[in-house]
């Protein structure tokens, strides 16, 4: 591990937890493990924003539907060609809400006062995530719409072509922050060649991270294929991600590293 990465990691985690498996480079780190455990190892008030796409656990109403693999729930691809499945998506709504509130509470303590939080979600879990956010002590401030522009048509029904970003802040959020006025609706199609089953468009995340103060440090507790970490770095931020699924820990780390090496002036 490069010395500068070790120093960066020491800035955010307690000394006794430094052996956490991790990967990264200049200004970015991905930690391998369970968010509930790792997030409690962070020092207080070290992050300027929390931006993440947690498991929705919403792919069906009945237990048999919820207990399907994430590829079966969220993709029409042949499983032989689909990205790996990911962990943590089989909770029922009540246990999911409790779990969300628990890690959000610990994450808030690791964020600076006024830090924004942005959480992706779909319509099924929208009410629950707003409860969890507030139970954890965050101030709920609104919702951003991601319009995917296309979706499967359903006769006699509205298309489900949007997902949402519930957002808030860790206490008061001064208007004097050096952040401009940001859109409330983003229109991007789903990525065509996805590394992750539920991967979000890179440009969408590049737009979202701008809610953070310039040059700040962003936390993504469910970094999957590393999209938020990559977007943060491309926009001039530092980033720390957490990923529990073995396959995505490696895929995400490799993706971020290779993408940054291909960028002029950002080679590791």
Located regions from the model:
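Asp-based, Mg2+/Mn2+-dependent phosphohydrolase catalytic module
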Residues: 205, 241-242, 261-268
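Conserved SAM-binding loop
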Residues: 252-253
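Core catalytic lobe of class I
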Residues: 1-7, 11, 15-249
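Conserved hydrophobic residues forming the short capping helix/wall of the S-adenosyl-L-methionine
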Residues: 133, 256, 260
């Amino acid at each position: 591990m490069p010395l500068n990465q070790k120093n960066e990691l020491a800035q955010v985690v307690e000394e006794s937890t430094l052996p956490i498996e991790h990967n990264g480079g200049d200004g970015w780190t991905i930690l391998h493990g369970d968010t509930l455990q790792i997030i409690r190892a962070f020092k207080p008030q070290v992050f300027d924003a929390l931006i993440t796409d947690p498991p929705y656990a919403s792919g069906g109403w009945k237990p048999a539907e919820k207990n399907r693999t994430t590829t079966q729930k969220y993709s029409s691809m042949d499983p032989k060609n689909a990205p790996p499945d990911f962990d943590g998506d089989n909770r029922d709504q009540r246990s999911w809400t409790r779990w969300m509130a628990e890690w959000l509470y610990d994450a808030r303590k690791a964020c600076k006062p006024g830090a924004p939080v942005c959480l992706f979600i779909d319509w099924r879990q929208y009410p629950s995530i707003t409860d969890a956010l507030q139970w954890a002590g965050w101030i709920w401030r609104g919702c951003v719409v991601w319009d995917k522009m296309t979706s499967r048509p359903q006769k006699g029904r509205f298309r489900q072509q949007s997902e949402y970003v519930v957002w808030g802040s860790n206490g008061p959020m001064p208007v004097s922050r050096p952040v401009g006025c940001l859109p409330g609706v983003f229109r991007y199609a789903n990525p065509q060649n996805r590394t992750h089953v539920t991967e979000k468009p890179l440009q969408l995340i590049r737009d979202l991270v701008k809610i953070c103060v310039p040059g700040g440090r962003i936390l993504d507790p469910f970094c999957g294929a590393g999209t938020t970490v990559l977007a943060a770095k491309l926009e001039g931020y530092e980033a720390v991600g957490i990923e529990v699924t073995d396959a995505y820990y490696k895929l995400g780390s490799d993706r971020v590293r290779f993408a940054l090496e291909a960028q002029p002036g950002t080679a590791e």
